[in-house]
Amino acid sequence: MNPTAEKPTNVRYGVLGFACALSMITYLDRVCFGTVMPYLQAEFQLSESEKGWLFTAFAFAYAAFEVPTGWLGDRFGARMTLIRIVLWWSFFTALTAMIYPSEGSVFPYFLLIVVRFLFGLGEAGAYPNIARAFHNWFPYNERGFAKGAVWMAGRFAGGMTAFVVYALMYETTTDGVKMEHWRHCFFIFGGLGVVWCIFWWFWYQDNPAEKAGVNAAEVALIQGGVAKHTDKLVVPWGKLLKSKNLWLLCGMYFCAAYGWYLNITFLPGYLKDQGIEKGDVKWTAQFWMAGLMAGLPLLVGSVSCLLGGYLTDWFIKRTGDVKWGRRLFGVIGHALCATCFFVAIFFMKNPWMFIFLIAFAAFWNDLTMGAAWASCLDIGKRYSGIVAGCMNTVGNLGGALAGILTGKILDWHTGDLVARSADFEAAKEQGWIFNIVLWGSAYVIAVICWFWFDASKPIEDEGHKITE
């Protein structure tokens, strides 16, 4: 039977469902740390810089192990690679809850740094290996939507994390001292990863042709004329390192991550300082408003992730222009994101308007996510896991730098300037303004990178020409 004569099955969307579920788990596990940070910071008595190093430990490990875990997926397949790394990071998620401060000792703090680093090591492989699975299961003109859906799911879960954490937290009072209990949240979130691995093991296959329920028409649709490779994978590192496209993609993602990391690191603490917190009673208007404000940038981002993925694929299907199909939405998204940051400077004394502008910035940033990750598949092809790993590696180095630099800038303003008789709150506001200028400027550079990036030029031809 001619495979094109029958209607393709839709088993590939089951892969998308698993990928979306995993994306949600990754965000629950990482965002919950930023959500509880105001309470952890008080319990461990940390400065802004010390808090920043905890965020940086995760981001640096996430960056350092993107390429190795992407290579593992390209070499051994997404099925077994994802099972191993999800179990790894789930263990360290739970272990976070078992570390307690010790008076006069810095050991618990350094142990937290190590655990956050090892947690990031595991999570580093999630999205490169999702990209690997999508390369096997989706034709290139559906990948933008698929990646957008994955990011939508993750951002949505991240946006709901504050609600979940606040609902799970409880208080006790001993000798008149109130204690917020947050540790059990990490045990619960760690368990979700184990459950996901069990179902993934039984359902997923790296080769669509070997999966029950996939017909020949769907296999033909997925392959899309791409030549199958049976040879041993040899990574063309020379071509990768010489690729202008790859360096532009990495530079763009570095700048975007530098600005975006605010949403899962310092923003919850800023809101608490401004009086936007959950209060002592659950399910009140104050509780819901605090959760909404903490998660708003990620919630609106979840919508734009899906929208951006749909738009980039729609543009390519309608025009056949892969270059502008990816570039256009990158330029628009990051340009408007930078604009929101610069405007937010004028609303520092209005926390409600400030958070809405930061949320709009997140919306425009996430409009680019489908195009960015689909571009990894466009130019990487059979090396898509490695290309995605390279992009996310450099991007999270931007996040790591943001964790260190943001905290240092805030501490310098509230320390050095106050020592010179400056008002503490005014000095802290100046520190925030300085950081906002840096975040907005980073997005301007990201726009420049998008203007030079061309997704229609693969690093190595795979027998499938991407038309413009």
Language model segments and positions:
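Extracytoplasmic
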Residues: 14-48, 263-268
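Residue-level signature of mid-helix packing/kink "hotspots" within the transmembrane helices
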Residues: 31, 59-67, 124, 159, ...
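Hydrophobic core of transmembrane alpha-helices in multi-pass small-molecule transporters
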Residues: 92, 106-125, 254, 340, ...
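Extracytoplasmic gate region of multi-pass secondary transporters
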Residues: 33-37, 241-309, 364-373, 377, ...
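Helix-loop-helix hairpin linking two adjacent transmembrane segments in secondary transporters
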Residues: 154-204, 208-209
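C-terminal ends and interior cores of transmembrane alpha-helices
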Residues: 87-105, 331-349
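Cytoplasmic helix-loop-helix junction between adjacent transmembrane helices
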Residues: 115-152
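Glycine-rich segments within core transmembrane alpha-helices of 12-TM secondary carriers
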Residues: 144-170, 193, 301-305, 392-403
